[in-house]
Swiss-Prot record:
Family: Belongs to the MnmG family.
Gene (UniProt): mnmG
Function: NAD-binding protein involved in the addition of a carboxymethylaminomethyl (cmnm) group at the wobble position (U34) of certain tRNAs, forming tRNA-cmnm(5)s(2)U34.
Residues reported to bind NAD(+): 273-287
Name of this protein: tRNA uridine 5-carboxymethylaminomethyl modification enzyme MnmG
InterPro entries: FAD/NAD-bd_sf, GIDA_C_N, MnmG, MnmG-rel, MnmG-rel_CS, MnmG_C, MnmG_C_subdom, MnmG_C_subdom_sf
Localization annotation: Cytoplasm
């Protein structure tokens, strides 16, 4: 049957990508449907119960700056918070939160169910109807047809999903859930470039069977961090400890002796697994010289005894899992509540995507999350937000934007998408700060300053968040002006206080603002001396802007040069064979990727600076010819 309501956006999948996509589209005013195989699993944390980490928290903050749900849900469910790299530079500091699975899922569901313009429907999607090269409807497992102007597909690991435990395998999207077989077959019929990837998860353990007394305690940070710009420590539930144990020589021997029973090493799994989150059998094989690996024992929540042993993801047979877990200190009597497993699934070459995450081959069909070859909740969520935003822009009038995608210098989201569509991926892609060439400008702490104004123009940021952002920016400007007006000299009261509190002897006069340039003086010192009343976030922004000013200015100069290339668009149907002087190899690479700008063309492996110059000259010449024809 035809469903009586027509939608602007239909989102398939209720994981981290799907929920952010649906919320973004609905916030912008699009009539949105979120189609999920099970309403009870909306926002499910299928693997580790944690949000954030190196590179990942930057993405979470960007989702938050654009009005998304992930960061606030983390503040409402986080049972341990830590700042990683806290002693390193501001660019690489990252917040990580251990989350209560049940509380996180509840927070996401509450947000979804209270979002205007958003309907939720429980049923699997079996087909996407395409007419004249454009997605027009989604068909469910029972034949219900939802007509729509755009489709966002966020299928996670469900497309053609196969679960492996030892040499036994079964079809599944994750443990306990059916895979999407018909939809996977349909996408293959549409001739989209498909591949197979693999990911895995460890066994879960009953905390009552664990001896924590022989493990290292890993407490959270004090004072407690927050994940969202709108978050507050008062939102946090009860805080708990994590623990650390280690594998040992016996553990490694057990695993090595059973590699022939591993689906990875026997050749049963064809898909490539995540390089930066390998299974324990892969770690022991690749790092044969190491006789021990850290294993983090992480609580799954406040109302469950289940533990997540981070670091022993595996697809070995259950009897082997039991044996190697029992070989570790503190886990000698551990009761396994769920076995670890690997899952193999379909993904589609992200080089077939536009920067908006719309497919190049089918109009108004957007992909987000693991279907694009990424791994991680944060990577999925930020893609979902981008895809949902651009799907909504197709249907909602916006005076500022026809489409939106951030550049590499604007957001880690821009880095992630550019990496995917330019280089593609043959293994699950994970974000790191090292992937961003402008990471000093793309800090976790300034995502709101980079993106919230854009989010407001897009319709993603509500009045409450916008007011909070404006108040913060006004406080930064006001406090900066105040500090610039306060002078310290070797003889005056302020100068003497500075020396007394910090040990820094003044040899000449300086403003309180300029004193922050000294490595040993921090905003907290100046705030105490000058009776500042601003909050820590404001002080942090002022201190970073002063201490890193020279480096930031140099990066900005690099960005200004790069923007000239970013502003030179390349038509999607550009004929690279007409560019005189390009080698056949470069022509083939450009034709395969179909870069949208000269800057993106320059990031393709093997495309030389000389080739970019030739391309720029040809584009300029063609523009002149076109202008002349239009004039006549």
């Amino acid at each position: 049957m035809q469903y009586p309501k027509n939608y602007d956006v239909v989102v398939i999948g209720g994981g981290h990508a799907g929920t952010e996509a649906a919320l973004a589209a609905a916030r912008m005013g699009a009539q949105t449907l979120l189609l999920t195989h099970n309403i009870e699993t909306l926002g499910q944390m299928s693997c580790n119960p944690a949000i954030g980490g190196i590179g990942k928290s930057h993405l979470v903050r960007e989702i938050d700056a654009l009005g998304g749900a992930m960061a606030l849900a983390t503040d409402k469910s986080g049972i341990q918070f830590r700042v990683l790299n806290s002693r390193k530079g501001a660019a690489v500091r990252a917040t990580r939160a251990q989350a209560d699975r049940i509380l996180y899922k509840a927070a996401i569901r509450h947000t979804l169910e209270n979002q205007p313009n958003l309907d939720i429907f429980q049923q699997a999607a079996d087909d996407i109807l395409v007419e004249n090269g454009r997605a027009t409807a989604v068909v469910t497992a029972t034949g219900i047809i939802f007509n729509t102007q755009t489709v966002v597909l966020t299928s996670g690991t469900f497309l053609g999903g196969v679960i492996h435990i030892g040499l036994e395998s079964s079809k599944g999207g994750r443990a306990g859930d059916q895979p999407s077989i018909k939809l996977a077959d349909r996408l293959r019929e549409l001739k989209l470039p498909v591949g197979r990837l693999k990911t895995g998860t460890p066994a879960r353990i009953d905390a009552r069977s664990v001896d924590f007394s022989v493990m290292t305690v890993q407490p959270g940070d004090t004072p407690l961090p927050v994940m969202s710009y709108m978050g507050d420590v008062s939102m946090h539930p009860e805080q708990v400890n994590c623990y650390i144990t280690h594998t040992n020589a016996r553990t490694h021997d057990i695993i090595r002796e059973n590699l022939d029973r591993s689906p990875m090493f026997s050749g049963k799994i064809e898909g490539v697994g995540p390089r930066y989150c390998p299974s324990i059998e892969d770690k022991i094989h690749r790092f044969a010289d190491k006789d021990s690996h850290q294993i983090f024992i992480e609580p799954e929540g406040l109302t469950t005894h289940e533990l997540y042993p981070n670091g022993i993801s595996t697809s070995l047979p259950f009897d082997v899992q039991l044996e190697f877990i029992h070989s570790m200190k503190g886990l000698e009597n551990a009761h396994i509540t769920r076995p670890g497993y690997a899952i193999e699934y379909d993904y589609f070459d992200p080089q077939n995507l536009k920067p908006t995450l719309e497919t190049k081959s089918i109009d108004r069909l957007y992909f987000a999350g693991q279907i694009n070859g990424t791994t991680g909740y944060e990577e999925a969520g930020v893609q979902g937000l981008l895809a949902g935003t651009n799907a909504a822009l197709v249907t909602c009038e916006n005076n500022e934007f026809d489409v939106w995608t951030p550049r590499r210098d604007e957001a880690y989201l821009g880095v992630l998408v550019d990496d995917l569509i330019t280089h593609g991926t043959t293994e699950p892609y994970r974000m790191f700060t090292s992937r961003a060439e402008y990471r000093l400008l793309l800090r976790e702490d300034n995502a709101d300053q980079r993106l919230t104004e854009t989010g407001r123009k897009l319709g993603l940021v509500d009045d409450v968040r916008w007011q909070a952002y404006e108040e913060k920016m006004e406080a930064i400007a006001s406090e900066t002006a105040r500090l610039k007006d306060m002078w310290a000299t070797p003889a005056n009261a302020l100068g003497k206080k500075v020396t007394e509190q910090t040990g820094e002897v003044l040899s000449k006069e300086a403003t309180a603002f300029d004193l922050l340039k000294r490595p040993q003086i921090h905003f907290a010192d100046i705030a105490a001396i000058t009776d500042s009343q601003v909050d820590a976030q404001v002080g942090e922004q002022i201190e970073i802007s002063v201490k890193y000013a020279g480096y930031i200015d140099r990066q900005q100069e690099d960005i200004d040069q790069m923007k000239r290339l970013e502003n030179t668009a390349l038509p999607i149907d550009f004929d690279y064979s007409v560019v005189s002087g390009l080698s056949n190899e470069i022509v083939q690479k450009l034709a395969q990727v179909r870069p949208s700008t000269l800057a993106q063309a320059g990031r393709i492996s093997g495309v030389t600076p000389a080739a970019i110059q030739l391309l720029a000259m040809t584009v300029k010449k063609q523009k002149k010819v076109k202008a002349a024809l239009n004039a006549s």
